[in-house]
Amino acid sequence: MLDTWVWGTLTLTFGLLSSLQGVSFNETANTCDILNCPKGFTCCVKECCPERKVWDPANDRFRFLVILACIIFPILFICALVSLFCPNCTELQHDVRRVDHQTPIEPPSIAPLESIWVTSLDPPPPYSQVVQMTPPTEPPPPYSLRPEGPAGQMRGRAYATL
């Protein structure tokens, strides 16, 4: 009877110890190690998972859009700043020109009237006004297949044998 009490106490003690650690036989069998995972897999919490590369196209489909946004947004920001300060820069350039008396102020260039194009918002004229019809003429005279000279003689060399 004493032996039964010892075996029961040992079983109870080891059972409580294993439950306190939270480790069972099934969990130790499912945990993986770096050596146990095949190539291309890494050890996750309880199993081997495929490796994820940071810029793998299968994992990140929007890589191109992210790179494009990282390039375009700073350029747009710089352009907005330049357009914000651009009128001030042109006024400063004119002020510098006026302060410096050695450089003459150039008058604005005037384009000749021939090079100025004016667009109107009116609809275009009808086709009959744009295309000028030629007056009807007489039909051309009929043509002959044989060329003739001024007096009805044949042109070219005359062969003595014919």
Curated annotation (Swiss-Prot):
The record's subcellular location field reads: Membrane
Q: Give the CC-aspect GO terms.
A: membrane
Q: Which stretches of this protein does UniProt put in the Cytoplasmic compartment?
A: 85-162
**Species in which this protein is naturally found:** Mus musculus (Mouse)
Protein's membrane topology: Single-pass type I membrane protein
Could you say which residues form the signal peptide?
1-22
Q: Where is this region: Disordered?
A: 134-162
For this UniProt entry, what is the primary localization, expressed as one broad class? Answer: membrane
Give TM segment ranges: 64-84
Query: On the Extracellular side, which residues?
Result: 23-63
Alphabetically sorted, this entry's keywords are: Membrane, Signal, Transmembrane, Transmembrane helix
* Domain of life per record: Eukaryota
> This chain belongs to which protein, by name?
Transmembrane protein 92
